[in-house]
């Protein structure tokens, strides 16, 4: 298993990153989200449409494979639980937190993909690992989400707007309350 976050340069193509940003700002179409989205914690900046889903699926599969390769001791198949877009505006920040929290305790791995560089600040930091990452456009960062050691936060956005594509991954297939764990659109 990895012992610190792993950064992969140019994980997303410039064209795909720009398409996602364009879809946030001017959706090509909007459709209702599937029923299982109601059990998801949080929201997304992305509209639900075929353009966004095609890109999300492409990088979901790449992210699943990347986590599997980075964590060869993982014997179960890593799949995407959810994908979402986030837009952080000037003044935004996030205190250290873990991704595997109620009601989504089954999240085991996370991926953050940076779509732009039109901001200052917004570093991703892991206080218990002594690791800080200054985001760069098109990079993907991969880390384990399971447990307090992997607590992470985002420093204050000093200027501009920070746009990301995020994935939460799991090896689990069933939820005790019957929720859809593995996103059928993305795996």
Which residue ranges define each predicted feature?
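Histidine-centered catalytic micro-motifs
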Residues: 93-101
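Non-heme Fe(II)/2-oxoglutarate
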Residues: 1-77, 183-187
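A short glycine-rich, His/Asp/Glu-containing loop-to-beta-strand
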Residues: 6, 77-92
């Amino acid at each position: 298993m990895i012992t610190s976050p792993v950064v992969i340069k140019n994980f997303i193509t410039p064209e795909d990153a720009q398409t996602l940003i364009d879809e946030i700002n001017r959706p090509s179409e909007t459709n209702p989200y599937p029923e299982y989205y109601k059990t998801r914690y949080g929201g997304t900046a992305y509209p639900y449409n075929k353009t966004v889903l095609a890109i999300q699926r492409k990088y979901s599969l790449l992210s699943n494979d990347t986590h599997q390769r980075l964590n060869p001791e993982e014997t179960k198949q890593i799949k995407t639980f959810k994908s979402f877009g986030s837009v952080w505006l000037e003044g935004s920040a996030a205190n250290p937190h873990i991704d595997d929290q109620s009601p989504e305790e089954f999240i085991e791995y996370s991926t953050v993909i940076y779509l732009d560089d039109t901001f200052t600040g917004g570093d991703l930091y892991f206080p218990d690992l002594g690791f800080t990452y200054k985001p760069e456009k098109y990079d993907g960062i991969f880390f384990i989400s399971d447990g307090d050691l992997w607590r992470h936060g985002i420093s204050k956005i000093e200027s501009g707007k920070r746009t990301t594509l995020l994935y939460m991954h799991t090896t689990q297939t069933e939820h005790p309350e019957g929720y859809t764990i593995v996103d059928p659109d993305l795996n």
